[in-house]
Amino acid sequence: MKAALLLTALTALPLPAAAEPALTPADTLPATPEGKAWKLAWNDEFNGEKLDETKWDVPEYKRRDSWWSRKAVSLDGKGRLVMSTLKDGDKFLDACVRTRGKLEHAFGYYVARVQLQKQAGHWTAFWLYNDCVGKVGNEGRDGTEIDIFEKPWLDDRVQQTLHWDGYGKEHKSKGFVPKVPGVMDGFHTFSLWWSPEEYVFYVDGKETWRTKDGGVCQAPLYIKISDEIGEWAGDIRKVKLPDEFLVDYVRVYDLIDKK
């Protein structure tokens, strides 16, 4: 069970160091440049009985072969967000939460601790996005979709991808697929260090991919955690539902000057 944590908004004055309770479990943060330190800027530990909608928006609309629905989003009362994939009549429902209009942020260290789905037919993701991704002409500097992870497979592979210059004929992308033994068992952390110069991706605190592809995005993005149904992940009609994707926490750290 995670310790409760008072959220400090990005626009608020920072709390004195002594007033900040410890996070449990603690994150393994990357080593910082000399004279710099990590500072927690935003987080959700998913304590309580229902989703904190001062932090999250819950979209509801058709997405690929299913519908994003509030019916698929809940908390388990044990400090975890539950994102369900289920059948509702003749429709399939799954889940998305996002910080659109609540947290739109550039740079820093983004980390989520999750337990992945058990069934085929749908894929889970932790990603950064904004409408600026649709801009064309300045490569990814004016907007990049950053997929910290996508998981369409039930094996050790993890998809990490960048998309820029919109989604039409000018669309460009670059990705990497590391193998992470045991990733389908228990909880794991997926994270990104996004600096003005490069992206560094991690799984369980270990670097998996370092890249500058597309020209590093300089625009604020918001967080999305989602589940989608489509052929990429297999045939949803052949699996046993409901299935669950659990999120233990999401945290964002800023790199600041040491005092």
Where are these regions (language model features)?
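Bacterial N-terminal signal peptides
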Residues: A4-P14
